[in-house]
């Protein structure tokens, strides 16, 4: 970890942490008769809520803001009967159970929620997300960094809402996203997904507006989990400079599974508006990086992603932790000690206890555990009557509840108990609800084995809590190899939950383990599980994120070019020259080059710009002459250059002229055959041949594999062609070979020779081939006469608005306002003076001129 990331020094610049989660730490119920709110502490998400609570501790170095949805709200009546309106029970909830939550109810909720946290010694500003945020006229203030597009200040103004609205918003996350992240293909049809998506985007916008209305400069926004995937982008649209950190608590699937989502691009672009993205394990970060590369075609490394907006997003792993001191203290408390004694009297030392606690989701793996336990009793009969499995199941948050899993679980429990049970022995004890906390910690303290058999899972807190409670007993932990916890607790016994026989053998081995072996294993487990507390985890996460945000800012080597910087020199200039690259500069790079065509708006902008008698506008592209003529040939005022200058059509010239006659192209046959070898090895790639160049294009191939192939291909080509006067140009998704004579530096010098004296130069490009163009204009202020002296005597035919003998073409020693603009990331080595994030920003700038 970077220096200083362990402490609070890196994040000292942040005054507040705006913590954003789907729900508050409590479940809320509203009595429809008395209009009184009651809160019940959530039993799930203990690690998350414990970490969040530590931010509101009086000793925290930051002030805290808690942003969350109050729902789903339970409704109680005068007789205290509660009608659940949780999302997982939506199928059985009647409309009569829905009530209107008035502005007065919402104000009382805020007051009660603040009191709830203060009783727990938590000081934080509470921001409940009920629904749409009202806009009121904006007062002049420097207290918020809001983009110009936001003309009104956001203000939280309460409105009446129906309680059912609080459960509709996140249903897309529960019914679709959860499935995909846990390697399950969504079962909802397109129409159902479309309706859920509309609610999801609206719900996410409510969150964004509430955050914007409460944001202050100096805040760090910390967003939790997949339900809020869209939130970073929605915030970024209104707070362009806000530091945003996103932490995914769920697993992340492979790109092949993620691409099943119809809204895959929107979801990825939503979360990629964060500055920093953190996940539970290294494998999840690898899957995420691979998905961004394969689905969006973005450039990635093991630590960051370069987005299409020209920004860099840092990605790393940081596993959550439990509140170890609290759990350890609870296990040694008097109430828990009494429960431990009761359990020991029920289950004497000759009976071994196996404990499991799972939410009844489609990926919980409870049935796998039960089948493995049955295998144990079949193949190792000595344990009949001597081992008991205590299984606790609970309903999950959201729409992930599986009726099928519940039925299978109950049937298996009944089958095992009927096969192997007796009057004085029940092999499986199944609790359908969470236990009292004292009973739960007592059970964890006395159990000989804890078993996690999930078929997909992130960080399982029960496994961590079990280790924290076992310092005296030193029990064994069996983990599914598909659980994210397996990457942290390396001393646990890993099993494939689908292999029931091996699973049963592992249970038998743990039951027969010697005390010495148990102690040795547990010693390692203890160190791994208690290496940090939940407070230490979230502090480290914030400090690491703060360090990365600061590092990203320090890497910005070129300033952003704005309209205000450009407009004065532009208006003062008498003769202006524009040199514009095409792919990746004027238009976004596309996975298929035939899709990367200019928009009508761009063509109108270029025509208007080139029609100004003081402007000389050239488009410099590696595209073929045919493509340039087809898409931009109608704009006679434009100068066009194809294949890096092999052919040009000057402004107002009626025809193209070749600049690459009599070049040695004997190398093309060799390169073509060599590229064909890589086409056969790389499915989806192809060869694109032009008159004077040849390219191997791999934008439609597997991104990771094709990059590896490209590096190998380039290395071999450099050795093969070292005796030829050619240049090998690696680009974003292709590898091109062309004569050294043809490059943007040489073509720009010839354009300058023909254009004569200019006092304003604007050149823009996005990759290495454009650095030759930028190099021509070193230093920033150059002498026209000095530049022309270096230019080759070859001249282009054709004319612009003056002829070659005009006064405008006479070389003068004029100071030139030069703008070399890189399109894309700001921290790449470049000779440019400024940067613009993306082609659309360049298009907007040119349009405004």
Curated annotation (Swiss-Prot):
Pathway: Carbohydrate biosynthesis. It is an enzyme of class 3 (hydrolase). Its main location: cytoplasm. GO terms for biological process: trehalose biosynthetic process. Residues 1-558 are annotated as: Glycosyltransferase. InterPro entries: Glyco_trans_20, HAD-like_sf, HAD-SF_hydro_IIB, HAD_sf, Trehalose_PPase. GO terms for molecular function: metal ion binding; trehalose-phosphatase activity. It comes from the Eukaryota. Keywords: Cytoplasm, Hydrolase, Magnesium, Metal-binding, Nucleus. It catalyses: alpha,alpha-trehalose 6-phosphate + H2O = alpha,alpha-trehalose + phosphate. GO terms for cellular component: alpha,alpha-trehalose-phosphate synthase complex (UDP-forming); cytosol; nucleus. Its cofactor is Mg(2+). In the N-terminal section; belongs to the glycosyltransferase 20 family. In the C-terminal section; belongs to the trehalose phosphatase family. Phosphatase catalytic subunit of the trehalose synthase complex that catalyzes the production of trehalose from glucose-6-phosphate and UDP-glucose in a two step process. This is Trehalose-phosphatase. It comes from Schizosaccharomyces pombe (strain 972 / ATCC 24843).
């Amino acid at each position: 970890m970077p220096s200083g990331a362990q402490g609070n020094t890196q994040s000292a610049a942040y005054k507040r942490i705006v913590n954003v989660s789907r729900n508050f730490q409590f479940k809320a119920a509203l009595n429809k008769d008395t209009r009184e709110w009651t809160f019940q502490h959530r039993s799930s998400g203990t690690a998350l809520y414990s970490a969040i609570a530590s931010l509101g501790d009086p000793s925290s170095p930051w002030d805290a803001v808690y942003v969350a949805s109050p729902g789903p709200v339970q409704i109680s009546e005068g007789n205290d009967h509660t009608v659940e309106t949780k999302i997982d029970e939506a199928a059985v909830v009647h409309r009569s159970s829905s009530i209107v939550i008035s502005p007065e109810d919402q104000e009382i909720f805020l007051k009660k929620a603040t009191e709830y946290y203060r009783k727990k010694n938590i000081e934080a500003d509470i921001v409940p997300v009920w629904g749409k945020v009202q806009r009121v006229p904006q007062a002049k203030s420097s207290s918020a960094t809001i983009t110009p597009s936001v003309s009104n200040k956001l203000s939280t103004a309460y409105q009446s809402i129906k309680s059912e609205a609080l459960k509709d918003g996140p249903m897309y996350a529960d019914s679709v996203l959860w499935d995909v992240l846990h390697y399950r293909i969504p079962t909802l049809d397109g129409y159902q997904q479309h309706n859920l998506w509309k609610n999801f985007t609206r719900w996410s916008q409510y969150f964004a507006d509430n955050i914007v209305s409460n944001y202050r400069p100096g805040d760090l926004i910390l967003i939790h989990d997949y339900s809020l995937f869209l939130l970073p982008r929605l915030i970024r649209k209104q707070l362009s400079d806000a530091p945003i950190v996103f932490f995914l608590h769920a697993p992340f699937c492979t790109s092949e599974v993620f691409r099943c989502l119809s809204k895959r691009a929107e979801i990825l672009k939503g979360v990629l508006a964060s500055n920093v993205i953190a996940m539970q394990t290294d494998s999840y970060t690898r899957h995420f990086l691979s998905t961004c590369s394969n689905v969006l075609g973005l450039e990635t490394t093991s630590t960051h992603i370069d987005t299409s907006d020209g920004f860099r997003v840092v990605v790393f792993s940081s596993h959550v932790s439990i509140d170890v001191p609290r759990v350890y203290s609870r296990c040694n408390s008097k109430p828990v000690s009494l429960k431990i004694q009761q359990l020991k009297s029920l289950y004497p030392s000759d009976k071994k206890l196996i404990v499991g606690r799972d939410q009844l989701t489609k990926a919980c793996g409870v049935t796998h555990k039960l089948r493995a336990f049955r295998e144990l009793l079949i193949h190792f009969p000595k344990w009949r009557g001597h081992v008991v499995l205590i299984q606790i199941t609970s309903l999950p948050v959201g729409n992930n509840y599986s009726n099928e899993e519940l039925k299978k679980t109950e049937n298996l429990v009944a089958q095992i108990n009927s096969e192997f049970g007796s009057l004085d022995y029940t092999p499986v004890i199944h609790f359908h609800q969470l236990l009292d906390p004292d009973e739960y910690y007592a059970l964890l303290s006395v159990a000989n084995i804890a078993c996690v058999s999930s078929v997909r899972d992130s960080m399982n807190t029960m496994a961590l809590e079990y280790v924290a409670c076992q310092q005296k007993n030193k029990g064994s932990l069996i983990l599914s190899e598909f659980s994210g916890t397996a990457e942290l607790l390396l001393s646990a016994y890993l099993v494939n939950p689908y292999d029931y026989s091996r699973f049963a053998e592992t249970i038998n081995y743990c039951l027969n383990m010697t005390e010495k072996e148990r102690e040795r294993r547990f010693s390692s487990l203890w160190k791994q599980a208690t290496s940090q507390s939940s407070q230490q985890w979230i502090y480290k996460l914030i400090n690491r994120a703060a360090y990365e945000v600061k590092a990203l800012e320090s890497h910005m080597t070129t300033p952003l070019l704005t309209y205000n910087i450009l407009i004065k020199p532009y208006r003062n200039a008498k003769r202006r020259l524009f040199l514009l690259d095409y792919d990746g500069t004027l238009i976004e790079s596309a996975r298929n080059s035939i899709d990367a065509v200019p928009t009508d708006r761009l063509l109108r902008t270029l025509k208007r710009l080139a029609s100004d008698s003081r402007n000389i506008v050239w488009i410099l592209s590696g595209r073929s002459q045919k493509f340039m003529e087809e898409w931009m040939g109608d704009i006679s005022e434009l100068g066009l250059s194809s294949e890096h200058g092999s052919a040009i059509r000057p402004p107002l010239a009626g025809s193209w002229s070749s600049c690459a006659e009599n070049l040695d192209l004997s190398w093309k046959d060799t390169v073509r055959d060599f590229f064909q070898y890589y086409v056969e090895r790389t499915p989806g790639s192809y060869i694109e041949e032009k008159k004077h160049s040849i390219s191997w294009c791999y934008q439609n191939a597997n991104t990771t594999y094709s990059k590896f192939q490209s590096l190998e291909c380039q290395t071999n080509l450099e050795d093969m062609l070292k005796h030829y006067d050619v240049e090998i140009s690696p680009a974003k998704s292709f590898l091109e070979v062309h004569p050294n004579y043809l490059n943007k530096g040489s073509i720009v010098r010839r354009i300058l020779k023909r254009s004569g004296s200019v006092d304003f130069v604007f050149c823009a490009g996005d990759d290495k081939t454009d650095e030759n163009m930028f190099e021509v204009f070193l230093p920033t202020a150059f002498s026209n006469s000095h530049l022309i002296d270096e230019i080759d005597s070859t001249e282009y035919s054709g004319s612009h608005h003056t002829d070659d003998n005009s006064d405008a073409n006479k070389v003068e020693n004029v100071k030139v306002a030069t703008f070399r603009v890189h399109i894309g990331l700001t921290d790449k080595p470049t000779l440019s003076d400024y940067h613009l994030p993306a082609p659309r920003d360049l298009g907007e700038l040119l349009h405004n001129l």
